[in-house]
Amino acid sequence: MEREKEQFRKLFIGGLSFETTEESLRNYYEQWGKLTDCVVMRDPASKRSRGFGFVTFSSMAEVDAAMAARPHSIDGRVVEPKRAVAREESGKPGAHVTVKKLFVGGIKEDTEEHHLRDYFEEYGKIDTIEIITDRQSGKKRGFGFVTFDDHDPVDKIVLQKYHTINGHNAEVRKALSRQEMQEVQSSRSGRGGNFGFGDSRGGGGNFGPGPGSNFRGGSDGYGSGRGFGDGYNGYGGGPGGGNFGGSPGYGGGRGGYGGGGPGYGNQGGGYGGGYDNYGGGNYGSGNYNDFGNYNQQPSNYGPMKSGNFGGSRNMGGPYGGGNYGPGGSGGSGGYGGRSRY
């Protein structure tokens, strides 16, 4: 039987004790299945643990079993497991943010709430489902939201970009509120924000501002709660330098969700009007703002220039050698925010 793609079988494990080794990490996670890979990420110079690692199971069902058994505690410390983000997604704004709300695009007129519920309830407990309609005509605007009681169903669903719902191709993404997008953009600008990617140009991984946030030799090690760092074998790394979303980016002034094009909406001008507090309060008016290009090419969702994944290109072996960070500088890049992963 052909094995499922690695991206569906890999977990990022944050918050590891510096005493945790590959052996103890493996011993802990093997209670849910066979591991095909296990690594604790270490500083290439000092060999000191960087406080996170990755485990890869032999099947997605084993990953599901492990995530269903949270919280996890290893060597006396509660760790934070999360489905690893694949390289091609890792640099997109919000890729590492933990949310319980899922955006669903490509909803057709004949798709009702029960279709979404029937499809998505297999992933986890659903709190709410919203299909957005035009306030005047009552027609569906082509998108909606599904909110779960936990972040893991969302993380699992977005591993697969397209889903067939009621016979139609739908695209899924994490739904980020305006505040969450501002935090992402704050981190992108190097101000640190809640994500603490910081500047990171001075090789070694400066995790955001303030004392104690230098991951290499910093006294509090876990990046002052500001994020984790680099990629491993193409997974989970932080954004490549200034290319956090790249250009056109997540609606960064260009186009946005449906911006001027037909998009998924049926009005030919984006999703129109404001909704909730999402995307800068501007799901439309010609753009879906902070969510990225949802134009005629659904794949242009928060694009990032290919190849600019931390400039590392996985040099120096399967774990990316020592060159993990933005622009190939050796900086750390960052893995999401304080407790958002």
From Swiss-Prot:
Residues bearing the modification Dimethylated arginine: R191, R201
Q: Which GO terms describe its molecular function?
A: miRNA binding; mRNA 3'-UTR binding; N6-methyladenosine-containing RNA reader activity; single-stranded telomeric DNA binding
Q: Where is this region: Nuclear targeting sequence?
A: 296-335
Subcellular location per UniProt equals: Nucleus, Nucleoplasm; Cytoplasmic granule; Secreted, Extracellular exosome
Q: Name one Pfam family in it.
A: HnRNPA1_LC
Chain positions with Phosphotyrosine modification: Y319, Y335
Q: Which sequence positions carry the modification called N6,N6-dimethyllysine?
A: K92
Gly residues composition bias: which ranges?
Answer: 190-211, 308-341
Q: Which residues carry this modification: Phosphoserine?
A: S17, S73, S137, S177, S189, S200, S213, S219, S224, S247, S312, S329, S332
Q: Which UniProt keywords apply?
A: Acetylation, Isopeptide bond, Methylation, mRNA processing, mRNA splicing, mRNA transport, Nucleus, Phosphoprotein, Repeat, Ribonucleoprotein, RNA-binding, Secreted, Spliceosome, Transport, Ubl conjugation
Annotated GO CC locations: catalytic step 2 spliceosome; cytoplasm; extracellular exosome; nucleoplasm; nucleus; ribonucleoprotein complex
Query: Which parts of the sequence carry N6-acetyllysine?
Result: K156, K161
How is the protein modified post-translationally, according to the record? Sumoylated in exosomes, promoting miRNAs-binding.
Major localization listed first in the record, in broad terms = nucleus
Q: Which PROSITE patterns match?
A: RRM
Carrying Asymmetric dimethylarginine, the residues are: R191, R201, R254
- Superkingdom per UniProt: Eukaryota
- Summary of subunit composition and partner proteins: Identified in the spliceosome C complex. Identified in a IGF2BP1-dependent mRNP granule complex containing untranslated mRNAs. Interacts with IGF2BP1. Interacts with C9orf72. Interacts with DGCR8. Interacts with TARDBP. Interacts with CKAP5. Interacts with PPIA/CYPA. Interacts (via C-terminus) with FAM76B; the interaction results in retention of HNRNPA2B1 in the nucleus and inhibition of the NF-kappa-B-mediated inflammatory pathway.
Q: What is known of its domains?
A: The disordered region, when incubated at high concentration, is able to polymerize into labile, amyloid-like fibers and form cross-beta polymerization structures, probably driving the formation of hydrogels. In contrast to irreversible, pathogenic amyloids, the fibers polymerized from LC regions disassemble upon dilution. A number of evidence suggests that formation of cross-beta structures by LC regions mediate the formation of RNA granules, liquid-like droplets, and hydrogels.
The task this protein performs is described as: Heterogeneous nuclear ribonucleoprotein (hnRNP) that associates with nascent pre-mRNAs, packaging them into hnRNP particles. The hnRNP particle arrangement on nascent hnRNA is non-random and sequence-dependent and serves to condense and stabilize the transcripts and minimize tangling and knotting. Packaging plays a role in various processes such as transcription, pre-mRNA processing, RNA nuclear export, subcellular location, mRNA translation and stability of mature mRNAs. Forms hnRNP particles with at least 20 other different hnRNP and heterogeneous nuclear RNA in the nucleus.
Protein name (Swiss-Prot/TrEMBL): Heterogeneous nuclear ribonucleoproteins A2/B1
Q: Which gene encodes it?
A: HNRNPA2B1
